Amino acid sequence: MKVNPFVSSDSGKSRKAHFNAPSHERRRIMSAPLTKELRTKHGIRAIPIRTDDEVVVMRGRHKGNTGRVLRCYRKKFVIHIDKITREKANGSTVHIGIHPSKVAITKLKLDKDRRALVERKAAGRSRVTGILKGKHTDETVN
C-alpha cells in the first residue's frame, strides 16, 4: 500500500524522472558504496563517486578488477576506470562504462569540500543511530 499520496508509484513516471534528471541529481544517483574498512573509518555507507577515487569492481565481467576513476560520465550514468578497456575492431582501445553501484570505493580523494561532506554525513548518521541504539533492553523485550 502506498503511504505518501504525493509520491507516484507509476514506473513510467519514475523512469522518466531518472533518465531526464539534471546533472546535479545524476551526481547523487551515481553514488557508490564504500568498502567495509572505509565504512568503519568514516562512518558512512555510500558517497557520490568522483574522478580520482580508487575502486574495485564488485559485479559483472570485470569483477575483482581495481583501478582509479578516470571519468564520471553523468550523461550515460557510467564511470570509466583506468585499467578496464576493450579493443575496437580498428585496433584502438576504449574504456568500458561501469555503473557506480557495481563498484566499491577503496580509497577516497579527499579535498576540503569532500572532507566536509563526509563529516556532515557521518554526523547525521551517528545522530540517527545514536537515537535508535539502546532503545530496547532485554528487560523490556519479552
UniProtKB/Swiss-Prot annotation:
SUPFAM superfamilies: Translation proteins SH3-like domain (SSF50104). CDD domains: KOW_RPL26 (cd06089). It comes from the Eukaryota. One of its GO terms (biological process) is cytoplasmic translation. Residues 1-11 have a biased composition (Polar residues). One of its GO terms (molecular function) is structural constituent of ribosome. Disulfide bonds: none annotated. Keywords: Ribonucleoprotein, Ribosomal protein. InterPro entries: KOW (IPR005824), Rib_uL2_dom2 (IPR014722), Ribosomal_uL24_CS (IPR005825), Ribosomal_uL24_euk/arc (IPR005756), Ribosomal_uL24_KOW (IPR041988), Translation_prot_SH3-like_sf (IPR008991). Residues 1-24 are annotated as: Disordered. Pfam families: KOW, Ribosomal_L26. GO terms for cellular component: cytosolic large ribosomal subunit. Belongs to the universal ribosomal protein uL24 family. This is Large ribosomal subunit protein uL24. It comes from Caenorhabditis elegans. The lineage of its organism: Eukaryota, Metazoa, Ecdysozoa, Nematoda, Chromadorea. The gene is rpl-26.
